[in-house]
Amino acid sequence: MEANMPKRKEPGRSLRIKVISMGNAEVGKSCIIKRYCEKRFVSKYLATIGIDYGVTKVHVRDREIKVNIFDMAGHPFFYEVRNEFYKDTQGVILVYDVGQKDSFDALDAWLAEMKQELGPHGNMENIIFVVCANKIDCTKHRCVDESEGRLWAESKGFLYFETSAQTGEGINEMFQTFYISIVDLCENGGKRPTTNSSASFTKEQADAIRRIRNSKGSWDMLGVKPGASRDEVNKACRKLAVLLHPDKCVAPGSEDAFKAVVNARTALLKNIK
């Protein structure tokens, strides 16, 4: 069994697990934990210095779970402190602020940091990840929509929740699902449960939706060079349409991506003789 897994327990027995939080500074990691554990919201921002540690007990089905929570500082300055806490982890709360695109874009870097610190023998497949799209109460400042965040999470087999530490929305549901998944992981010999969402669309579909969403124009969206012929434009459009048609693709954002492809084709063909 992998090093990050606790010893397998019989049903009904207590279980001890380690959970860490990851994400940029000021995305609300500490506030999410406080909202769940202490049922309160701290409006004044207090930066986490290095690591905050806490213990809580929860019950999942007929088991008592002792949860050791390591709330890790998101500022790069504290890398030398937090890099000691990645190992022997069963669950990760990965947080970004829906009003800060850079905090969403940084999620891949956080995963890379964890993978680096776990080393060649570490296995991130034996860890439950939950992605929290936090601060959804700040609707006016939102710049990362739900479909974009959900696509990123589900394409990696991660859980995904929309949360607000301020109002409490999504917090309890997130933690309950998170802990149940960790218990299932432990009882399944360290194998991450396969979610329906992670198996419902392909990496090719997810990559295509992300590329379309981030494209800089119609040529870029279809993946053809400026000045391409009508046949080349139609061929590129057909390929993407088959891949992303809403009747066949259930990936978050597929319907909008499909419409964008059709509109891009129409716009380009107007200017091609």
Curated annotation (Swiss-Prot):
PROSITE patterns: DNAJ_2, RAB. This is DnaJ homolog subfamily C member 27. One of its GO terms (molecular function) is GTP binding. One of its GO terms (cellular component) is lysosome. It is found in: Nucleus. GTP binds at residues 23-30, 71-75, 134-137. GO terms for biological process: phagosome-lysosome fusion. It comes from Pongo abelii (Sumatran orangutan). GTPase which can activate the MEK/ERK pathway and induce cell transformation when overexpressed. May act as a nuclear scaffold for MAPK1, probably by association with MAPK1 nuclear export signal leading to enhanced ERK1/ERK2 signaling. Residues 1-18 are annotated as: Required for interaction with MAPK1. Residues 217-273 form the J domain. Interacts directly with MAPK1 (wild-type and kinase-deficient forms). Interacts directly (in GTP-bound form) with MAP2K1 (wild-type and kinase-deficient forms). Keywords: GTP-binding, Nucleotide-binding, Nucleus. The lineage of its organism: Eukaryota, Metazoa, Chordata, Craniata, Vertebrata. The gene is DNAJC27. Its main location: nucleus. InterPro entries: DnaJ_domain (IPR001623), J_dom_sf (IPR036869), P-loop_NTPase (IPR027417), Small_GTP-bd (IPR005225), Small_GTPase (IPR001806). Belongs to the small GTPase superfamily. Rab family.
